[in-house]
Amino acid sequence: VEILPIANLLTMCMFGFILCHELAHHNLGHIYEASHKQQELNADTQGFQYLKRVSHQFEQLEFLKIPPNILGAPVIAMIYLQALEAIGIISISGDTHPSVPQRIQNLYEQFNKAADKEARYLYNGLRLSCVEFIDEMNKMKNASC
């Protein structure tokens, strides 16, 4: 497996999900209300549905290439955020956003409904690499203390 093309697709899908998430906030009318945790989960869910729709148009779109087998990318992005939060680099959870584990669970449920065998295989490999990466980050953090 060539890493660079997968990394490129993964990055594009993560970025695409962020855009879809923000579009979902707009379409769900969240921009007119005070932000709260359920809105974020709703925007994650709707944003994933938008991303899935884009992935189903993979063959028709000339430049936007998000194949269905990379739909686990939003979950992987949240796992990255969880790792950064765990070692104290960022803080995401608060009054307006649900915990990262809640968002991972919500997005994983969406992914699991949509994923085929190839998407699950790729997701599992990426998830396991995240686990190794998080372990290494924790070792480096502990070594510097």
Indicate residue ranges for each PLM-predicted region.
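Active-site recognition of the HExxH zinc-binding catalytic motif
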Residues: F17-H30
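An active-site-proximal "capping" alpha-helix that borders the catalytic cofactor pocket
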Residues: H36-V54
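Long, well-structured alpha-helical subdomains associated
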Residues: R53-C145
